[in-house]
Amino acid sequence: MKEDSTMTYLTQKEAQEIDAELMGPKYGYTLAQLMELAGLACAQALHKVYGPERYPRVLVCCGPGNQGGDGLVAARHLWHFGHKPTLYYPKQTDKEHYKSLLRQCETLGIPVIGANFSEAVGETDVILDAIFGFSFHSEPRAPFDEPIRSFQQTQTPIVSVDIPSGWDVETGNPNHVYFTPNVLVSLTAPKRGVKSFPGRHFLGGRFIPPGIVKSYNLKLPCYPSSDQVVEITAVQGEDK
């Protein structure tokens, strides 16, 4: 665990341990609950920066794992916030909860595509990157190598969920091999690899029990009003 005067930055192992403890017998959270809270936070952060008046069309890029589940939840909330999301979801899972999340999007009329990514990028106002999370540790392969390469080249604003796809959770993107999003929404606590992230940075995790904050000695900012996210760009900038 890496700490400074105002913020805790987690390693991959610590992030996994906190998730496991949240879903353990003491706290009783389910994966579905955590996914819902994470997706809501991501949707709220995107909406704050890229409102639907100027950025109505959102291309939500979902991977096959939990990160993709966060994206499915976010797409639904973005629709309710007045955006016009489209799901890029080329590698769907057979897990029942993910099927339910997808069905919820489809009943709202949210388009779902699995190909023609470059065409979809040209028809959107902002991208939500929910492809790979903090457990990913290899070179991106098809069908996700194309969008991650495109992220490096596009001028369309990108919002990434928790860790930008392709980045290492602990070392980040030191050689600038991968794209740097405009906005990052860290979940629970920011990860070590994003400590030097230069863009606008939000934290979503307004559900962490005091017992976990205490046992992991987490240093986290206060959330304003009833918001599910807090901007930590200024706090992070002060720590550089």
Swiss-Prot record:
GO terms for cellular component: mitochondrion. K(+) binds at Q67, D129, S165. (6S)-NADPHX binds at N66, Q67, G68, G69, D70, G133, F134, S135, F136, H137, S138, E139, D162. Catalyzes the epimerization of the S- and R-forms of NAD(P)HX, a damaged form of NAD(P)H that is a result of enzymatic or heat-dependent hydration. This is a prerequisite for the S-specific NAD(P)H-hydrate dehydratase to allow the repair of both epimers of NAD(P)HX. GO terms for molecular function: metal ion binding; NAD(P)HX epimerase activity; nucleotide binding. InterPro entries: YjeF_N_dom, YjeF_N_dom_sf, YJEFN_prot_NAXE-like. PANTHER family: NAD(P)H-HYDRATE EPIMERASE. Binds 1 potassium ion per subunit. It comes from the Eukaryota. It is an enzyme of class 5 (isomerase). This is NAD(P)H-hydrate epimerase.
